[in-house]
Regions:
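Conserved N-terminal phosphate-binding loop of PLP-dependent enzymes in the Aspartate aminotransferase
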Residues: 1-153
């Protein structure tokens, strides 16, 4: 127990270290950049990011929740607070670990895996509109249940 992180927001799952740039990793990186992350793939991923953002924003507005969603290209994240953080410190201070865990478990029980440590999704070349729409429906259900119970802050 003495070795456990004291801060629930501690990043214990990052990737790094001296062996992160080995030959296999570099070959995989080169293949990904040359064969997977093409211009067409980015058009697809960014379009899905906009769709994901719209689904989350619609649920937040429809249920009157003091939350927000932010998108940068194909990366979309929602935070359970009204104000958008301006710095990393703002984001950390505005976290809600209990609500984060709840939404992750709620989504996981319905077939959706969110990025660990925050409520973020990255659209990939393999992501489909059906994947995004599934998340939008599940997020809307969770938002409705939380709003109904007043358990959203």
């Amino acid at each position: 127990e003495a070795m456990l992180p004291r801060d629930e927001r501690a990043d214990v799952g990052g990737i790094g270290g001296t062996v992160a740039a080995n030959v296999l990793s570099l070959a995989a990186m080169r293949a990904t950049l040359g064969e997977v992350l093409t211009d067409d793939a980015f058009v697809h991923m960014i379009s899905l990011g906009a769709r994901f953002e719209a689904g989350v924003a619609d649920a937040i507005e429809r249920h009157g929740l003091p939350w927000h969603v932010t998108r940068l290209g194909c990366r979309v994240e929602y935070l359970f607070r009204a104000e958008r953080p301006r710095t990393g410190s703002d984001a950390a201070a505005g976290g809600n670990p209990e609500l984060d865990r709840l939404i992750h478990l709620y989504a996981l029980n319905r077939g959706i895996l969110l990025t660990p440590f925050h409520n973020m999704a990255l659209m990939s070349p393999a992501t489909t509109e059906a994947d995004v729409d599934l998340h939008s429906g599940v997020f809307d259900e969770a938002a409705a249940e939380l709003a109904e119970r007043g358990a959203y802050v």
